[in-house]
Design a protein with these regions (language model features):
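An N-terminally biased module of ancient metal coordination in phosphate/nucleic-acid-related enzymes
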Residues: 1-74
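Extended substrate/RNA-proximal surfaces in nucleic-acid metabolism proteins
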Residues: 56-120
Length: 120
C-alpha cells in the first residue's frame, strides 16, 4: 500500500543502479512509494520496462533522464522529467555521448598498454 511518497531520482542497471528497471519499481512498491522517476545517467533504456512494471503493480513511473553536460571545465548533471524516450534527437545525443565515452576508454586502455600495464 502506498503512503503517497515519491522518489524523483532513481537509477537502474541501465546506468549505475543496483536494481533492474522492473526490480526498482517492485522495490518502490515494497517501500510504499506512489511514484518514482527513472533518471538513469545518459540512458533511457530502462524506461519501457519500468513503465510496464509500474502499470502492472500500480506504481506511477515518470520517464526521466540525468543528462551529463560539460560546463566551464566541469560536468553538470541535468535532470529531465516526462521526457519522450523515443525522441530521435535525444536518442542521437545519447548515442553520440556513448560513442565518445567508448573512444575515451579505448584511448585509456591504449595508454595503459603503452606503459606496460597488463590487461586481460
Amino acid at each position: 500500500m502506498s503512503d503517497g511518497s515519491v522518489d524523483l531520482h532513481c537509477h537502474t542497471t541501465a546506468s549505475d543502479g543496483t536494481f533492474t528497471p522492473g526490480e526498482l519499481v517492485e522495490e518502490a512498491r515494497r517501500r510504499g512509494l506512489a511514484a518514482i522517476a527513472v533518471t538513469d545517467h545518459d540512458s533511457v533504456s530502462g524506461i519501457d520496462e519500468a513503465t510496464a512494471k509500474g502499470a502492472e503493480i500500480d506504481v506511477e513511473v515518470v520517464p526521466g533522464l540525468e543528462l551529463s553536460t560539460d560546463v566551464d571545465n566541469g560536468e553538470v548533471h541535468i535532470l529531465g522529467y516526462f521526457i519522450d524516450p523515443e525522441d530521435r534527437g535525444l536518442l542521437g545525443l545519447l548515442e553520440s555521448q556513448r560513442e565518445s565515452r567508448l573512444e575515451r576508454a579505448r584511448k585509456m586502455l591504449d595508454r595503459l598498454s603503452d606503459l606496460g600495464v597488463q590487461l586481460s
